[in-house]
Amino acid sequence: MSENYSFSLRKFKLVFLGEQSVGKTSLITRFMYDQFDNTYQATIGIDFLSKTMYLEDRTVRLQLWDTAGQERFRSLIPSYIRDSSVAIIVYDITNHNSFVNTEKWIEDVRAERGDDVIIVLVGNKTDLADKRQVTQEEGEKKAKELKIMHMETSAKAGHNVKLLFRKIAQMLPGMENVETQSTQMIDVSIQPNENESSCNC
């Protein structure tokens, strides 16, 4: 039993990128602890957390690297992108400039990793829909053009956060067979929970 567990437990590095105050840390905190802190504190440099995810017949360990959005820390980021499995590019749907700037973050990822990385574009803060500056269609269009995954979330309300990480886990290298075998079961178990969310965004 322990042998099978050791074999199936693979580690994957997920790097969170994006401008300052788009909610990178809040997404990680919601996923890790199911909590949201209203007090904003800028990430200084790089933070690291790890969480084990239990899927249908596979267990994976996700290493979550939270990067600072400030310009003065930009020189640190390429070294963290270099050996990542997933790059999660976050923007704030109430800040159009943060959406525009996702292009340079994606360019940085491509420069370091080429096509050997999963890139996910995430529009955060859907709980502030009345202040929205970026439509969901704009996000989906950009993701389609770049052939990457797109999802909107609210770290504050918890909307789509678990689903985001579940979908990322399904896309990880070596997970193709698991996804093929259990797609229907996953859809049935996840979607109703998300639809029942109290968030109207």
Curated annotation (Swiss-Prot):
How would you describe this protein's topology in the membrane?
Lipid-anchor
Q: Give residues with lipid attachment (S-geranylgeranyl cysteine).
A: C199, C201
Query: Keywords for this entry?
Result: Cytoplasm, Endosome, Golgi apparatus, GTP-binding, Lipoprotein, Membrane, Methylation, Nucleotide-binding, Nucleus, Prenylation, Protein transport, Transport
Q: Name one Pfam family in it.
A: Ras
Stored Gene3D superfamilies: P-loop containing nucleotide triphosphate hydrolases (3.40.50.300)
Q: Where is this motif: Effector region?
A: 40-48
Name the positions where GTP binds: 18-25, 66-70, 124-127
Against CDD domains, the record matches this protein to:
Rab6
Q: Name one GO biological process term.
A: protein localization to phagophore assembly site
GO cellular component terms given for this protein: cytosol; endomembrane system; endosome membrane; Golgi apparatus; Golgi membrane; nucleus
Where is this chain's protein located in or outside the cell? Endosome membrane; Golgi apparatus membrane; Nucleus; Cytoplasm, Cytosol
The family note in this entry says: Belongs to the small GTPase superfamily. Rab family.
Q: This chain belongs to which protein, by name?
A: GTP-binding protein ryh1
Organism name: Schizosaccharomyces pombe (strain 972 / ATCC 24843) (Fission yeast)
